[in-house]
C-alpha cells in the first residue's frame, strides 16, 4: 500500500515536542510539554501517556539529546562494522538508564547517525522500530537528515522534510494536551 501525507514537527528547548502526521485525511498527533505526554489518533482517540511510553517520549523530546548521548545512555559497546545502504557503519549498542538497548549505526567517514534500532512502548505493546536517516543537509551550520525511513512489524514509511527552520517562535500551549472534542 502506497499512501502519502504530510508531517509537521515542532520542537522547543529544553524538551517540548509536537508531531502532526496526516495520511488520507486522518490525523495522528503526539505532544510533550516538558512534563506530560499525549497522543491523538483515529484508533485510540485522545489519551495521556503514562509509564514506559511517557518516559520514552520524555527522552525523545529532549531537544539536545543528539548532542548529549551520555545523558541518555549509561554504557556504549562497539560491536562491529555493518553496511547501511551501501555505507560502512560502526554499530554501537547503547544501554538505556531505564533498561533496554538501542543500536546506533554511525557512518564511518562522517560520524553521522545512519540508523537507530530501538524498542518503543505503545498501546499495542512493545514494538521494535528501525529508523534510517539520510539526505543530511546543512541547516544553519548543523547537519540534519531530510529523509527518515521508519519501519516496524506494523508499518513502513518514509518522511521527507521539505524545509527545516531554526529559532522559530513556538507557543508553549501547542505542546499541551488539547481539550477533548
Predicted regions, residues:
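N-terminal mature ectodomain segment of secretory-pathway/periplasmic proteins
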Residues: 1-45, 73, 77-78
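Gly/Pro-enriched, hydrophobic low-complexity segments
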Residues: 88-179
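Short, low-complexity Ser/Thr-rich regulatory SLiMs
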Residues: 11, 80-83, 135-138
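Short, solvent-exposed loop/turn motifs
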Residues: 2, 27, 37, 45-47, ...
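Short, conserved active-site entrance elements at the starts or edges of catalytic domains
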Residues: 56-91, 112-117
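Short, solvent-exposed secondary-structure boundary motifs
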Residues: 1-3, 17-23, 64-74, 93-97, ...
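Short amphipathic beta-strand/extended segments with alternating polar/hydrophobic composition
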Residues: 4-10, 30-34, 47-54, 106, ...
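Acidic/charged, solvent-exposed loop-and-adjacent secondary-structure segments enriched in E/D, K/R, S/T
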Residues: 38-64
Amino acid at each position: 500500500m502506497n499512501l502519502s501525507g504530510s508531517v509537521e514537527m515542532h520542537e522547543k528547548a529544553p524538551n517540548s515536542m509536537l508531531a502532526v502526521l496526516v495520511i488520507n485525511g486522518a490525523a495522528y498527533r503526539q505532544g510533550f510539554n516538558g512534563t506530560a505526554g499525549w497522543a491523538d489518533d483515529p484508533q485510540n482517540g485522545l489519551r495521556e501517556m503514562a509509564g514506559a511510553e511517557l518516559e520514552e517520549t520524555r527522552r525523545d523530546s529532549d531537544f539536545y539529546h543528539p548532542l548529549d548521548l551520555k545523558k541518555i545512555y549509561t554504557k556504549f559497546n562497539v560491536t562491529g562494522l555493518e553496511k547501511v545502504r551501501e555505507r560502512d557503519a560502526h554499530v554501537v549498542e547503547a544501554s538505556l538508564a531505564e533498561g533496554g538497548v538501542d543500536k546506533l549505526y554511525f557512518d564511518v567517514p562522517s560520524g553521522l547517525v545512519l540508523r537507530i534500532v530501538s524498542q518503543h512502548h505503545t498501546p499495542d505493546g512493545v514494538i521494535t522500530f528501525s529508523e534510517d536517516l539520510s539526505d543530511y543537509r546543512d541547516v544553519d551550520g548543523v547537519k540534519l537528515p531530510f529523509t527518515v525511513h521508519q519501519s516496524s512489524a506494523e508499518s513502513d514509511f518514509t518522511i521527507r522534510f521539505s524545509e527545516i527552520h531554526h529559532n522559530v517562535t513556538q507557543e508553549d500551549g501547542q505542546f499541551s494536551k488539547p481539550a477533548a472534542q
